[in-house]
Regions:
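Long, contiguous, secondary-structure-rich segments that constitute the structural scaffold
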Residues: 1-11, 88-104, 108-187
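Long, low-complexity segments enriched in small/aliphatic residues
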Residues: 1-91
């Protein structure tokens, strides 16, 4: 093995164990406690409050679905062989494994829309679309939800379905898991 990879080096793994907070394995300074300003579990963030954000998490209800957009899109699932569009489209072998966007849809939702495994579907949201994908009928997603990979381009790019105005105020992260959409079988 070392002959095949002469540049490889070993890095010792951290010692496994329980109660790492007791002996300083959670903090860069080696002191006992948690890796927070106080060294304790912080339920209220003084740092967030200092900058005018809520010190405690606030519940916000999800975007309400409508008759027209009656499914919720979870955008951002990943497959180990497709990380970003660059790694996929530059690799013919990866395109042989999966050559287009696949979207998981619950069997009940698929049946209600006349969609079968492998059908080409169009996804539209109040913010954009349509996005073209192949249907994967699966119990992996609950009723009322579809699940799409990210990283596809052009007419398969799910980013155009996102609500750009609905972001977490502290991190700026978009609401990738609650966008209302509708799907239909492509004619």
């Amino acid at each position: 093995f070392r002959d095949a990879l002469p540049q490889i080096s070993r890095i010792p793994a951290p010692k496994p164990g329980f109660k790492k907070y007791e002996d300083g394995r959670l903090r860069p300074d080696g002191k006992p406690g948690f890796n927070t300003l106080s060294g304790k579990l912080d339920f209220f963030s003084d740092r967030a409050a200092k900058f005018g954000y809520p010190g405690l998490p606030e519940y916000k209800p999800m975007t309400v679905l409508s008759k027209e957009f009656d499914l919720r899109l979870m955008n951002g699932s990943r497959k180990p062989y497709i990380t970003h569009s660059k790694t996929r489209t530059d690799q013919p072998y990866l395109m042989e494994i999966e050559d287009c966007l696949h979207v998981n849809i619950n069997p009940r939702d698929a049946e209600a829309r006349g969609i079968k495994e492998g059908d080409t579907i169009l996804i539209t949201s109040p913010y954009g679309g349509p996005v073209e994908a192949k249907a994967v009928v699966s119990l992996i997603v609950p009723v009322g939800t579809i699940d799409a990979q990210y990283g596809w381009l052009d007419n398969q790019n799910t980013q155009k379905l996102m609500n750009r105005g609905n972001r977490d105020p502290l991190s700026g992260y978009p609401s990738y898991f609650e966008n209302p959409v509708r799907i239909e079988k492509k004619a």
